[in-house]
Structures are given as structure tokens and as C-alpha cells.
Amino acid sequence: DQICIGYHANNSKKQIDTIMEKNVTVTHAQDILEKKHNGKLCSLKGVKPLILKDCSVAGLVLGNPMCDDFLNAPEWSYIVEKNNPINGLCYPGDFNDYEELKHLVSSTNLFEKIRIIPRNSWTNHDASSGVSSACPHLGRSSFFRNVVWLIKKNNVYPTIKRTYNNTNVEDLLILWGIHHPNDAAEQAKLYQNLNAYVSVTSTLNQRSIPKIATRPKVNGQSGRMEFFWTILRPNDTISFESTGNFIAPEYAYKIVKKGDSAIMRSELEYGNCDTKCQTPLVAINSSMPFHNVHPLTIGECPKYVKSDKLVLATGMRNVPQKKKRGLFGAIAGFIEGGWQGMVDGWYGYHHINGQGSGYAADKKSTQKAIDGITNKVNSIIDKMNTQFEAVGREFNNLERRIENLNKNLEDGFIDVWTYNAELLVLMENERTLDLHDSNVKNLYDKVRLQLRDNAKEWGNGCFEFYHKCDNECMESVRNGTYNYPKYSEESKLKRKEIDGIKWESMGTYQILSIYSTVASSLALAIMVAGLSFWMCSNGSLQCRICI
């Protein structure tokens, strides 16, 4: 009768890497690197993105006439801006601290537009003629919706003095501007005053003077406009004073809801889908801790790494035995590979006795290993799968060195994460395979310590009993209740019987060996004597006897 200790094997082709080996085939493995995506821009946790189409953030906040679709934008999860939107500053010019403004917008989920200085309140100035063919709407000249371009009235431009107090509980985003004419004639035509200025006082003090200069035409305009913005806190006051060239605020934005928004560069349209993680190119819905789809993300995202493969071993080495061995399908132990016939556990036994043969998994050690490995995998995923965002940052032309430094830092972080992820997987895979080897060895030692000299170790993971071991006996070995004294006498007799056969065989071999040696020597002596007699008789050999 025989019992073997072994482990599960299957038809799996999954391969993992360890510190010491590459492409190790295992019975079970779990991929922790997400490579799949849906190729769409999606809502983020049920909230749609604000896709600006051909508009820029500047066109959105100033109210470019071509961006009327976004005049009252609902709450958004993130903003999508094309790489080169055509509807931004329709009247050529510049937006002061534009990158900071985009950063502010990217951390906001909802604006509410309110009127702070009504257009019809400018009774001493022309508030309707300030339009341009550069900002058309329905084929007619128009202007930005949220500001008013004030012109002289009746050849007079009285000094403007306006104050606004923020009585709201929210912060206010306020925008204004200054016009830089092409020449003095245009300055006089529009504002009458040649030495004009625009002064703004709030938490900052700013005084701007028109820069009159000849410039090339852009969008049909030789003049330029410069726009500014500020955040007005609750109960704070902003004051405007101007003698010309003033582009006054009509509307401001209450920052109703701040949050984890972002501005993404993408040419995609809305894909009518929902996701937890969005990149500029695709959406990712995954519970894996790592991904290699795109480095820029928003939402609850896996961490981006440059790896192509991150697979955690959860099972053991998959080395199925080539074929059954011996009579009645005898099978070897774990030294010679795993068992595909054992399907209800990772480790277990195969026995052969007078009642038949069969497999039995050791469910206790299997469950303990499963629990340990499952907890380890879940722990890795939980620790790595925290909310992680990596959004692009905006820099102006004077900040290219900072932008390059920032890019190098981000690339360095990605390299570190990639190295850490790959090293983590290699180390954990090594530990997992060692754990399985240790569990099989522990099972083997458990049997060996019970059987002691009641069975013979074959050295391949199997034991041959010196006594009869029925199914009840086999079960006692498996569950650790084997009664060694009960079978020791029978085993002792069996060992003596085997030893006696050995000694008897050894004695027979010695007698045969002696007989063979004597017979060979006698035959050789007779042959030598006969040869000598023949040679003496024909004179070939002379024999002398001396006394």
C-alpha cells in the first residue's frame, strides 16, 4: 500500500516572473495592470464633462459669441478643450495670467453667472457701439457677452468711478479689460481723451495705460485688447476708475462648487458612457492598481506605469506529470510534478491500497494558503488603488524652463512607480511560490513524522507502508490521527521478512561466488599441467630434477 503527497496541476498557460526566474508557468495568476479602455470621453461618476468643442477657456469665461452654447453651463466633472481651439479671443490680444485662470477653472465644477454692473447703467457712455467684425454673430459685428466695451458719448468720455461689493457667500470671478488702439486718431475717435488710464483697486492695485502702436492686422484688427481677472472674496469690494479704453465687467461668475476637476486636451466627442477614471483619449473602468494607458488622468484611477506586464502569482508552479506510472496507474509524488486529477484543492494525497486508489485534497492547508494569498493581493490593490490624478499643467512662454523641469519631475515619478511596481510583483511572486513549496513540504513532513519506520520513503514524495493500510487507515494519515503503535508490530515483522530475504540472497550469492572461484582455479591448474607434460614429451621443454 502506498500514499503520496502532491499538488494541483492544470492546463493553465499563465506565466509570471520572479526575482530569480522569468516566464514561470503557474496554475493561477492575477493581472494587476490594466491595458484595456473604451476609447471614449465619458461622464465621471454620473456627471458629464464640459466639452468646449471649438471654444477655449478664454472664449468660455469672456463669452465669445461663437460659444453661446456654454453661457449657462451646468455642473461638469472635467473640461475638454481641443489642442488649438479657434474660438478664444476673437478680438486679438492677451489674457493676463491665463494659465492661472485655467488652473482656477480646472479646480471648479460649477459656475453661476450673475450680473454685477448692468449694461444700461452706463448712461454717460455708449455701451452699445462697442462691437467688432472680429467677433461676429449671425453675420453681424458683436462682442464678448460678459463684458462691455465703453465708447465716448456725445464726444465726451466722463471719468468712470464704479464700485462693486460682493454680498454673496461665494467667491466671484470678475473680468475686465483695456483696449490698445492702433494710433492716436483711433484713440480720439473712440475715447476722446488721449491720455487715458484704467485703474482697478481691490485686494490688488492696478493701473493700466493704453499702449498706442502700429501693429499688423489680426482678424482684421490692428488694435489689441488685454484682459484681466481677479477673485473677489465675500464682503470685499472692487473699484474701477477710467478715463478711456475701459472694457467693463457686466457679468461675473460665482464659484459655486469647487472640486477635483481638470482641463483635458482632446479631440474626442462625448461617448455617452460613464466611468470612474478618464484620460484625454480614453476612459478606464478598472479595479486594478496599475495601468499603462495614458499618463494624464482624472478620477479614481490606477497608477500609471510604463510596464507591459504585471502579473501576480496566486497559484503554484504548473508542472503536470507527463503520464501515469506503473501498475494500476501508480503515481509519483510532488518531486516529479503536479496532479491534474486533484481538482478540489491545491495540496493533497494520492493513495493506493487493496480497496482501490484515489485523490484527496488537504482542504485545511489549501484554504489557509488561499486566504493568505487573497488577503495579500487585496492588500496590494487597496494600497495602490487610492484616488490618483495626474493632470497637465499650463505654462506661459516665459515659463518653459519650469515646464521642462516639471515634465522631468513627472517622468521621474513615473519611472519610480514603474520600478516599484515591477519590483513589488517580482518579490511577491517569489514569496508566493516559496509559500506553496513550503506548504507541500510541511504536508510531507506531517506524514513522515506520523509513519516513522512503519513505511519506506521512496524519495519522490511517496511512502510505501510496511503494513496493510485500508481506507480508514489512509484517512487517519491524512487527518493527522494515524495510530503508529497499532501498526508498528506488523511493520516490524514485515521489515524482518524483507531483511531476511536480503540476507538469504546474500548467502547464496557468496556460496556461488566461492564455488565459481575454486572451479575456475582448478580448471586453470589442469590446463597448465597438461600443457607442460606435452611440451616435455616432445622435447620443447626440458625438465630437470635436482636432489
From Swiss-Prot:
Residues modified by glycosylation: 10, 23, 165, 235, 285, 479
Keywords, comma-separated and alphabetical: Clathrin- and caveolin-independent endocytosis of virus by host, Clathrin-mediated endocytosis of virus by host, Disulfide bond, Fusion of virus membrane with host endosomal membrane, Fusion of virus membrane with host membrane, Glycoprotein, Hemagglutinin, Host cell membrane, Host membrane, Host-virus interaction, Lipoprotein, Membrane, Palmitate, Transmembrane, Transmembrane helix, Viral attachment to host cell, Viral envelope protein, Viral penetration into host cytoplasm, Virion, Virus endocytosis by host, Virus entry into host cell
Domain of life: Viruses
A Pfam entry, by short name: Hemagglutinin
Disulfide bonds: 4-462, 42-273, 55-67, 90-135, 277-301, 469-473
Positions bearing the site annotation: Cleavage: 325-326
Transmembrane segments: 511-531
GO cellular component terms, semicolon-separated: host cell plasma membrane; membrane; viral envelope; virion membrane
Record note on modification: Palmitoylated. In natural infection, inactive HA is matured into HA1 and HA2 outside the cell by one or more trypsin-like, arginine-specific endoprotease secreted by the bronchial epithelial cells. One identified protease that may be involved in this process is secreted in lungs by club cells.
Membrane topology: Single-pass type I membrane protein
Record-level GO BP terms: clathrin-dependent endocytosis of virus by host cell; fusion of virus membrane with host endosome membrane; fusion of virus membrane with host plasma membrane; virion attachment to host cell
Extracellular side: 1-510
Topological region Cytoplasmic: 532-547
Lipid-binding residues (covalent, S-palmitoyl cysteine): 536, 543, 546
Gene Ontology molecular function, alphabetical: host cell surface receptor binding
Cellular compartments annotated: Virion membrane; Host apical cell membrane
Functional summary from the UniProt entry: Binds to sialic acid-containing receptors on the cell surface, bringing about the attachment of the virus particle to the cell. This attachment induces virion internalization either through clathrin-dependent endocytosis or through clathrin- and caveolin-independent pathway. Plays a major role in the determination of host range restriction and virulence. Class I viral fusion protein. Responsible for penetration of the virus into the cell cytoplasm by mediating the fusion of the membrane of the endocytosed virus particle with the endosomal membrane.
Additional observations: Major glycoprotein, comprises over 80% of the envelope proteins present in virus particle.
Entry's family note: Belongs to the influenza viruses hemagglutinin family.
Oligomer and partners: Homotrimer of disulfide-linked HA1-HA2.
Name of protein: Hemagglutinin
Name of the gene encoding the protein in the UniProt record: HA
